[in-house]
């Protein structure tokens, strides 16, 4: 009642960007630095760092520069998902799609129901890409501007998988050295 245009304040600042969230982690080990944009851990680290912003709708993109080639992982999950760690330190669950860049030829874990070998992997200096459509819950992964599996996030086709569950989506990573 009695609300005028002058009574509305534009969200400020605009163009907000997610960083890694040092306050919301699973397990132990790993170090975040450089304004929460860089994460480093030793071999077989099981620390999982989610992003500070979750996506309820729309199309979202994140990229990470891989600076070592040991056992890193990136992924997308339902924000309410409780992560479970399997024997090799991978992250998988009913609402997560994970790319294990450290396995011999790369491996995807999709909602705990399937695993795909020969998924590709980056190397030192590779730009690892993750795209999501929060409305359809589709996920795409890429390396150095090449989408895996002929994926096309712009067209909404050939996704790696569709995240189960229904909550907001978050990006996450497990170190073996990344910088976003």
Give names to the regions the model predicted.
Residues 1-180:
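PRY/SPRY (B30.2) beta-sandwich protein-interaction domains
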């Amino acid at each position: 009642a009695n609300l005028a245009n002058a009574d509305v304040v534009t969200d400020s600042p605009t163009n907000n960007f997610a960083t890694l969230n040092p306050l919301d982690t699973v397990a132990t080990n790993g170090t975040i630095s450089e304004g929460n944009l860089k994460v480093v851990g030793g071999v077989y680290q099981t620390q999982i760092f989610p992003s500070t912003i979750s996506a309820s709708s729309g199309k979202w993109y994140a990229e990470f520069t891989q600076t070592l080639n040991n056992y890193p992982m990136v992924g997308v999950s339902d924000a309410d998902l409780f992560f479970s760690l399997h024997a090799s330190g991978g992250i998988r669950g009913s609402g997560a799609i994970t790319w294990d860049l450290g396995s011999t030829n790369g491996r995807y874990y999709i909602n705990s129901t399937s695993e795909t070998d020969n998924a590709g992997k980056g190397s030192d200096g590779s730009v690892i890409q993750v795209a999501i459509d929060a409305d359809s819950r589709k996920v795409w992964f890429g390396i150095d501007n090449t989408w895996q599996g002929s994926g096309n996030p712009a067209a909404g086709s050939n996704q790696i998988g569709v995240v189960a569950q229904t909550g907001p989506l978050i990006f996450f990573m497990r170190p073996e050295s990344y910088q976003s």
